[in-house]
Amino acid sequence: METVLVAGFLCVYDDNDINDNFYLPRRTIQEEINSGNGLNIPLNINHNENAVIGTVSSLSVYSTVCFVARVQSKEFLTIIKKIAAKSKLITNTEEKTLPPDPEIECLNSIFPGLSLSNRVGGNERDPFFKHVSICGVGRRPGTIAIFGRNLNWILDRFSSITEAEKEKILSTDQSCVQFFAEEQFKVDLYDLLADSLDTSYIKVRFPKLQSDKQLSGISKSTYIKASENLTANNHTINVNSKVTKETEATDSVSQDDCAVHAPDLISTICSTTHTTHHDLVRMNGSATGNSASLPAPQFSECVFLPKDTFCSLLNATAGAQNKNVTPAAPIFKTDEYITPYPESLSRVDYGNRMNYHIPPPYWYPSMPGFNYKSYRGSQKRCAPTDSDDEMSFPGDPDYTTKKKKRYREDDDRELTKDKNDIKELVDAIGMLRHEISALKYIRSQSPQRQHCTAVDTMPTIEEKNVASPKPSVVNASLTPGQDRNQNLMQSDQSLLSLNKKLFVEALNKMDN
């Protein structure tokens, strides 16, 4: 694969309108070059560090900062070669003196700008030159790139480079030993397509390239698609304002004059790019109207207009032409539809709405809100209490209803319930006393009274069982008197223990 070189200016010191943010001090650049930091600087695409395509072989400072680099990435050159083979306009150059080289022309068309990435402040130990990028257009004035196969041919394109400076650049380039690894180029065709898409959104690209070409002193034929060299003083472009001097005179023209000369101005503006309408017609072999018979105007005849002025000229031209207006459909009047029932206003014809009687809205009295909370409270069941499960005694007036669920509605019912519980306890104690008195009376009438002790000193069944052990011998006699006395005593003891148990439970309940 043949060698591809690129050269150009990274900064032009003769320009007085340079921005301070992009200013490169001449003394700092010279010191960095003398210290050997100006060689083997990476060359990439649009400041993408993953798209390194070569290295810088020469960097020198004169009236400009001139650099020379070699494109060494084989994969990148293969992509450019395929793009150039697919393009139908890339080899259609007006300059027949240049040798046909689709790859070089493709590189000059896609990446005509240069940009140097350098250190601004920060750590002084970091390298001053970070990388050089080829791009769609550079920010610094005069930063335009020229690709070629021969370095002498590239340097001859710049009229501002003297013969002595050219010899120094050639000697520095030949003595430089370059190192490049193919792994540094990590992008593909989609990344390059995205860069081209971003470049197409730059509005001032072509005026900036025209100014850079004039400022760099490129006088001979090149592959750059940045229009012809500007020589007329009346058409000198101001980079900051991006408006020609003839624009001021155009603004003072009246609206009638603009309408008369609008077709000429429009055809003149369309010829500012390198590929004019005349060229496209000549390539395709056909045209509409009389456009094919009109010669392509020269660049000195071009007039640059602001966007607002151009749009106003288009509107004036469109208004002056006769237009066949399509008549609108006739509007037929519709009869009013009368119904025996009143309709809503939206269903009445628009023309009859003013005469339509709308009844006033009916006023409904406000209804008091329903007290839902009180209704829920009255139907809510109270929490169960211990009194619901207590034992009932015979003779109790609430004996049959004591197991039913109770509900309390307010505090008065709760107080009444507490009083009833106390009354029940008093009645139970009275019944226990009555039972004890009856038991004492029965015991006093028993014929075996002398064998019984008093109730107050009589031990319980548990104490009797503990105190008196069971007899070891059981008699099987049928003495009627003894069995009767034993059965009576056992019934008395069981009834007494039951009453005591109930009495203890009643006392425990009163304590709680």
From Swiss-Prot:
Residues 492-512 are annotated as: Interaction with major capsid protein. The lineage of its organism: Viruses, Duplodnaviria, Heunggongvirae, Peploviricota, Herviviricetes. Disulfide bonds: none annotated. GO terms for cellular component: host cell cytoplasm; host cell nucleus. One of its GO terms (biological process) is viral release from host cell. Keywords: Host cytoplasm, Host nucleus, Hydrolase, Phosphoprotein, Protease, Serine protease, Viral capsid assembly, Viral release from host cell. GO terms for molecular function: identical protein binding; serine-type endopeptidase activity. Region of interaction between pPR and pAP is called Amino conserved domain (ACD). The region of interaction with major capsid protein is called carboxyl conserved domain (CCD). It comes from Human herpesvirus 7 (strain JI) (HHV-7). This is Capsid scaffolding protein. The active site is at residues 47, 115, 131.
